[in-house]
Amino acid sequence: MSRNFELLQQAGLNLTATVEMPPTLERELGARVKKENGGSRAFAADLDRTAKEETLKLVQSVFLLQGTSTNHRAVVFAAIDSGSGCSRVCVHAAQMLAANVSGSVCLVDANFRTPSLPNAFGTTNHYGLADALRTEKPLRGFVKALDRNLWLVSCGSAGEASTNLLHSEQMKRRFGELRKEFDYVLIDAPPLNTYSEGFALGQLADGLVLVLEANATRRETATKVTERLNATEVKILGAVLNKRTFPIPDSLYRRL
């Protein structure tokens, strides 16, 4: 049994998907962000075939095969540690979901300390969630259209001092508005091992997708975070093993 899957098993997690981002592609995306002066549209087409398949599997498992009576789903994406690629997983899941459903999909950047979703789409970060939490203006005024059925609420005028807003009663009200306005809501949250916002947001959502970094996330840390999620009654809808690399050709690996 590999170290990665042993980690998942001992932490009591069921693997939903493994997402590989080839180093060459990651460098290309980074270069494109700089070239386009701070923005890059990280479309799902940027993923290789295997990553697309895994992202589709994640979307089907979490959003489309739950057997619920309604399509309204609100899910938090949160990594255990920083630097695990959670925002990228969340972005590609939203794009894949929007491409496979007729309903509306909304991405929400709730990572106030290190927001990244606007950069992924080459749009601005101003006038977003933090601003919406300070006013009673209609939520639609803080939403940016990205595609036919894909929308974004950036973090807005946020910062370290604004994180308490994510624990507020106004956040509960805004979350309710998001559910009414959109068929699917995907929230990118801060890492769970360092900050508490992901737990609070998970309690408002239908559940949480946990993102782990292959060969980096420690078993003890994963277990501690999982236990706290259970204690706070946050449902874990899936676990994603990100940044996994294949030392042998993928076509051969998948036959093993």
Where are each of the predicted segments found?
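P-loop NTP-binding module
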Residues: 1-256
